[in-house]
Amino acid sequence: DARKGFEQELAKEGYKDGKNLKIDYVNAQGDQSNLKTMSQQLQKDKNVLNLAIATPAAQALQKQDSKTPMLFTAVTDPKSAGLVNNVTHPDTNATGVTDKVDTAAQIKLLHKMFPKAKKIGLLYNAAEENSVVQIKTAKKVIKSLGLTPVEKTVATTNDVQQTAAAWAKQSDAMYSPTDNVCAAAMNTIGKVTESAKVPVVTADAT
């Protein structure tokens, strides 16, 4: 858990919430429409430092407040997301760590595990730059293996049940990137694909 890890590291340095540190914690609860309001509230709070977990949260917060120092984590590609112009030497108010995975290797692993699968389903939120970057790579690798990518997009967790059901019927195997909407609805995806007897490989440990 990114938040817990951050707090644990602060504690190691002698900073503890409620003693010599105050932490304002807000959670979108899987609904990205809440991010703008949350970012506005954090800006009003005039914090010394903000931590954004995941690409959509970091983008929303930086758009609202480009001055307060911001750390980000669980961001796949900070440059493509517009958070920094240079990942080696960040030149904005933001810096942090990425959770970028080797998408090509994961697709090749999927193919090795399920060699008879010819149609590979790809489920993601097209509004998440982190997902778009991974899907672009996934499609390229899938095609290079002589397979067919089957794309389906979701905007919120409410879309997942119906979309995943249609997705499962059209796919022999499925791949889900480090996508926040999909991660929040992974139980639903698991139930749908299990029922359809379609294997799933995910980039997110969730």
Predicted regions and their residues:
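Short hydrophobic alpha-helices and adjacent helix-cap/hinge residues
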Residues: D1-T206
